């Protein structure tokens, strides 16, 4: 007697999954350029959260820190220690860059997991983490590439390019290729992990909308934090490597 309703529910779940679309974007025309509006919206939300948190952190600091001040100081110390471990004693100027990368990616990843997808209706596509878009992750990876080239050239001048023929000129093509594989690996690792996590949650919510997706969502939060840490650690390691001149 209950076979037909169960079959209908199963078919409905499969139909909901068939509606999950990848690569659907809501576009804005800005100055003759076509931009992904949902990426800009969520990026602005992330930037607003970070700027608001920074304003709160520096407002009225106490000699005896409050719980909130302790939290912000812990975050700063964590970023400083991460940068120092990878870059070395000349880490100071790079703390803002590595910190910005880590915090932007961390909050972006969490925004995709915590921000209700249906709370804002868009003509096409849905809100998602900025790091769910390959354009964002490629831009972050290219910024990292510019940063480690700048670090190497600032430290060594034109002598920085001598690393391409070390330890032997035979490795010149491989060393040049490495400069292309670094941003590729950074961008695709971050993009793939965040996209896969959000798709898994969407599919599970379509099938079993109550209890089952919750553990996966918590796992996604953990994975999102790990991906931000990996990106920031590798960015700092590349900068330190360019300044030291060894692999």
Curated annotation (Swiss-Prot):
Pfam family, any one: ATP-synt_A
Gene name linked to the record: atpI
Keywords, in A-Z order: ATP synthesis, CF(0), Chloroplast, Hydrogen ion transport, Ion transport, Membrane, Plastid, Thylakoid, Transmembrane, Transmembrane helix, Transport
Subcellular location: Plastid, Chloroplast thylakoid membrane
Residues that span the membrane, as ranges: 38-58, 95-115, 134-154, 199-219, 220-240
Protein name, entry field: ATP synthase subunit a, chloroplastic
Assembly: F-type ATPases have 2 components, CF(1) - the catalytic core - and CF(0) - the membrane proton channel. CF(1) has five subunits: alpha(3), beta(3), gamma(1), delta(1), epsilon(1). CF(0) has four main subunits: a, b, b' and c.
InterPro entries: ATP_syn_F0_a_bact/chloroplast, ATP_synth_F0_asu, ATP_synth_F0_asu_AS, F0_ATP_A_sf
Family: Belongs to the ATPase A chain family.
Gene3D superfamilies, alphabetized: ATP synthase, F0 complex, subunit A
A molecular function GO annotation: proton-transporting ATP synthase activity, rotational mechanism
Record PROSITE patterns: ATPASE_A (PS00449)
Membrane topology designation: Multi-pass membrane protein
GO cellular component term of the entry, any: proton-transporting ATP synthase complex
Xref: PANTHER family: ATP SYNTHASE SUBUNIT A, CHLOROPLASTIC (PTHR42823:SF3)
């Amino acid at each position: 007697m209950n076979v037909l309703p169960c079959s209908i529910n199963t078919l409905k779940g499969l139909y909901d999954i068939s509606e999950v679309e990848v690569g659907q974007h809501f576009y804005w025309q800005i100055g003759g350029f076509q931009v992904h509006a949902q990426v800009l919206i969520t990026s602005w939300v992330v930037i607003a959260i970070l700027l608001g948190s920074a304003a709160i952190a520096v407002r009225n600091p106490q000699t005896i820190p409050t719980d909130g001040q302790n939290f912000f100081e812990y975050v700063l110390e964590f970023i400083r220690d991460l940068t120092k471990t990878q870059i070395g004693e000349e880490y100071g100027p790079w703390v803002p860059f590595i910190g910005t990368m880590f915090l932007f990616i961390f909050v972006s990843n969490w925004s995709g997991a915590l921000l209700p997808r249906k709370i804002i209706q868009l003509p096409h596509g849905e809100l998602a983490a900025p790091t769910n878009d390959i354009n964002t992750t490629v831009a972050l990876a290219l910024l990292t590439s510019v940063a480690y080239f700048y670090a190497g050239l600032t430290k060594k001048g034109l002598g920085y390019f001598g690393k391409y023929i070390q330890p032997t000129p035979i490795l010149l093509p491989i060393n040049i290729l490495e400069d292309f594989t670094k941003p590729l690996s950074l961008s695709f690792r971050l993009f793939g992990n965040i996209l896969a996590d959000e798709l898994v949650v969407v599919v599970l919510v379509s099938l079993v909308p109550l209890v089952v997706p919750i553990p996966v969502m918590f796992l996604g939060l953990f994975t999102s934090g790990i991906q931000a840490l990996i990106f920031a650690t590798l960015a700092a390691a590349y900068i330190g490597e360019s300044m030291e001149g060894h692999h």
